[in-house]
Every structure is written in structure tokens, then in C-alpha cells.
Amino acid sequence: KMCGVTQNWESYESTKKASQLNLTPEQQRFPQRYIKLGIFVDHGMYTKYSGNSERITKRVHQMINNINMMCRALNIVTTLSLLEIWSEKDLITVQASAPTTLTLFGAWRETVLLNRTSHDHAQLLTATIFNGNVIGRAPVGGMCDPKRSVAIVRDHNAIVFVVAVTMTHEMGHNLGNHHDEDKCNCNTCIMSKVLSRQPSKYFSECSKDYYQTFLTNHNFQCILNAPLRTDTVSTPVSGNELLEAGEDCDCGSPANPCCDAATCKLRPGAQCGEGLCCDQCRFTSAGTECRAARSECDIAESCAGQSADCPTDDFHRNGQPCLNNHGYCYNGNCPIMFYQCIALFGSNATVGQDGCFDANDIGHKYFHCRKDNEKYIPCAPQDVKCGRLFCTYIYDIDLCRYDDSANGMVAQGTKCADGKVCNSNRQCADVNTAY
């Protein structure tokens, strides 16, 4: 299974090495994000490959290159920040129960791992056969959370690409994606419920919409900035679109006019090989816009003229009024319920009446403010507009409509009253102290 759905292939033809994809105009709708991965190989997988750490390392690097290729459709660059092989013993108890193992791995990351290394998302690769033939599991929307920014994946196929699809699928869940439904018209795409005999390297339009909505509502902080070269574990084969220690440029193709494929050094006369501020092997002139402002809460960045990199993505201070005082800036966006309703239910949607939100004081699976130890915590009366989002249609204002997924909760930073916003604990807090 993938996340509890049956695996249905018997064989798979050898796949060609993943090729690099150029960004399409469609991908420009997503802001650039960077995910630093920590990969942990359990002792069972170490034993499976006869203790050959070099073979395992090469296999993991190939997986990362495939993941990076697939994530380009979301304008995400993935880097291997940490690779740890548990050659002596497992550092957690890897059980046949996938939910239990995921919980243990998340707790270990929060209490042990984050104290000794920096990364954004951790995955455990295991040889353990999980109950129900599950091959992967991850929390939906857990990215950047100390305990929930994790996934577990069984090394279930000899073909690297097939396992990499599963790893990308689980990371997709962490980024807010749910399984593709029938209406998505893509039964082989990355977020499909079932991993097909020939899995696709593409995200469906449904997945892209989910990611865009979730990114707008949450704007994960840990994946905003590009990794340093010293943050990246060097790969045996270059051409991964990442600059690693010792490289001037990424030497993936001998045809690259800026970069010498044999040495990963710049060709004579070249200032740069790639980057938002690199044009025809030269630094773009100072003042050239390299990242447009995506909202009135964001700040456009311009090239400095001395580097190929676009400056760090910056934005106006949190709490600054926006959209004619209908909202407050939060991490470069202006989250308001009206636009969240449109994202969920279309252009005829608007915010539901105040009475709809009173359901959030029930403490139900769908109507609550928080969840603690599997118990749903009801919203306090003053916090009901920070729980489940209720919408309606302009032609039927008495309707209380909601989306029961994670995307259906009111986004953090959303205005819940005059001078107040929803904080990370789903409380309607003073805008001056909420962040």
C-alpha cells in the first residue's frame, strides 16, 4: 500500500536516468522553496544490502536526484543535508505498525535529532515490511513541525525511481497534499492512492492546487532560504542542480556554455553558471528584479550585480494592515477568510455567517481548535473563528459549508476580529503579540 492503499504491480521495466526538466511558465506560479532532507537508513536496510554502505549511499543519492527532478514542478529544490546509516543498531524501535513507527521517528527527531543537526524534513528508509503492505506514511501538512516533518518509507523495490516516487509522495503529504481523487484524471500521478506498475514523475493539477492553497495559508518558514554549500552532502554524480562544496557551478551537461563538465569550474570569462541573477554566464546588472512581490505584504528582490543569487526572500513585518484593513500581513501573505473560501469553493464563495463558526466549540473531529493526544479540543467562544473555516455562496448566504481536510481550517495569521489574528495555537490573539 501507499498510505494504506494496496500496491498493485508485479514488475517494472528499468527506467532511464532522471533527466533535468526546465521550469515552465506554469511553475512560475509557485514561489521558490528549498527543502533540506535528512535521510536515515535503518539497520534492516543496512543488512539487506549486506552492510555495503557505499552501495546504499549511491542508491540514496540517486533517490534524491529523482525527488529533486519531480519537485521542480512545484518550484521546490531538494538537497541532501544529512545521510545517516544505522550500521550498528536502530536508534528507534522500527515496528511492523507503520503509524507506531512514524510516531516514534517523529518523537526521536524532535527530542534528539534537532539538537544535533539542522534540516527541514526527515525520512526513515527501512527494510521492514509494514502491516497491510503499507509502503509509506507521513502526516499531512507537517512540514517544518519538529515532530511531524517526517515520513517513513519502505525500500520496497529494486528500482530507485519507484522508491523515490514513494518518498516524494510522502513528502507531498507533508506539504499539505491529499491523495488524488477520480476527478483529477491522473491515476498514475505522484499523489495517486495506488502506486501503479509505471508510476508517473508528475504531480496532478489537483496536487498543484492543494500545494498552492496550503502554501498560501501556511508559508512554511523552514523552507524559505536556499541551503549553504556546506549544508549539502556531496553526491557521487554531479548534475543535480545544486552547488556543493568545491564546485563553482553545477556541471550536469557538457553543453553548458558556462561550466566545465569535467571540473565543475566556470569556463574562462564566465562569472556564473546559473541562478536568478545570471544571464549568459554574466551577473545580471544591479537593480534587475529577480523575484516579484507576490502580494502587498511581500517585497520584490533585485539583483546586486555581484552575485548570481537572488537575495533572500523578504517581506513586510507581520501584523501590518493589508487589503484595506481586511487583514494583517503574515510571512509575506495577507490571509483573509474571503480568499480562503474562494480557494476552497470557487469564485462564488464568501465567508459564512458568524453563527456557522459556533460549531467549533463542539470539540468534534471536524469542528475544533486543537488536537491533543488524539483528543479534539473545542474552541473557546472568543476563538471560534480560528478553528474550522465556514463558507457560503453569494446566492445562498444561509448555507454553512466547510472542507473537512487540513486545508479547511482557518489559516494562521488570519484576521479573526479587529486588531486580532489567529495564532499558532488557534487562539484569536492581539496582533501585536500573536507572532
Curated annotation (Swiss-Prot):
Keywords (alphabetical) are: Apoptosis, Calcium, Cell adhesion impairing toxin, Disulfide bond, Glycoprotein, Hemostasis impairing toxin, Hydrolase, Metal-binding, Metalloprotease, Platelet aggregation inhibiting toxin, Protease, Pyrrolidone carboxylic acid, Secreted, Toxin, Zinc, Zymogen
Q: Does the keyword Transmembrane apply?
A: no
Cofactor (UniProt):
Zn(2+)
Query: Posttranslational modification, per the record?
Result: The N-terminus of the metalloproteinase is blocked.
A single Gene Ontology CC annotation of this entry is: plasma membrane
Sites of Pyrrolidone carboxylic acid modification = 27
Miscellaneous comment: Negative results: the metalloproteinase does not bind von Willebrand factor (vWF).
Q: What is this protein called?
A: Zinc metalloproteinase/disintegrin
What is the native source organism of this protein? Craspedocephalus gramineus (Bamboo pit viper)
What lineage, starting at the top, does this entry show? Answer: Eukaryota, Metazoa, Chordata, Craniata, Vertebrata
